[in-house]
Amino acid sequence: MKAHPYGTVPAAFSPDGEIGVFESNSILRATVRASMQDHGLYGRTEFEASRVDSFLDAGLVFGREAQVYLLGLNDITTETHARMAAAYEFYVSGIDEALKHQDYVATNELTIADIAYVCDTGQFLRERRSEEALLKNGFQPISLGFEDDYPRAYRHLTSLAARPEFANHLGRLLEGV
């Protein structure tokens, strides 16, 4: 517990096991910082790194609400559905707006902001597989209009998910959504 006081997952540790890193975005950052390659995944300048951080931070509320929402789909409440809808709209509309001006979320090249976006949004889109449970409780899936409402965000998700480096890790996550 010294290295990781919260004891939650996901978690990563320094090679000697002395330092624990927890939470997905922190693990993304640590992985890129530890890389010996200059691949630009955390931006190329300090300001680009801060912009990447901004998108990762904006995704935190979305990710937290999505976790609560997805785990409770069978007993969804009006409040939970409304909170998730607001978090979804805020996050995905910001991504869509950013993609008006460049091909990637935070900078002009692929960064961990894009990786986090694909992973978080891909996970959330699984709600569509639970449409029957939602309808039974009087709700529609929040993401039903994703393709039309946020076309740039949708195209970005699907184009990145089709790339081998994403497809190899996503597997069948986006199948049927």
Locations of regions flagged by a protein language model:
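GST-like domain detector, emphasizing the conserved glutathione-binding G-site
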Residues: 1-85, 90
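Short amphipathic alpha-helical segments and their helix-coil junctions
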Residues: 10-11, 89-104
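Active-site-flanking alpha-helical
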Residues: 32, 36, 120-121, 170
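Surface-exposed helix-capping loop/turn segments at secondary-structure junctions
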Residues: 37-38, 97-108, 131, 163-170
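GST superfamily/GST-like fold recognition
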Residues: 52, 105-140, 144-152, 160
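Structural signal for well-ordered, non-membrane alpha-helices
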Residues: 60-63, 92-96, 157, 161
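Alpha-helical packing segments of well-folded alpha/beta enzyme cores
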Residues: 84-95, 120, 153-156
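Long hydrophobic alpha-helical segments typical of transmembrane helices together
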Residues: 143-177
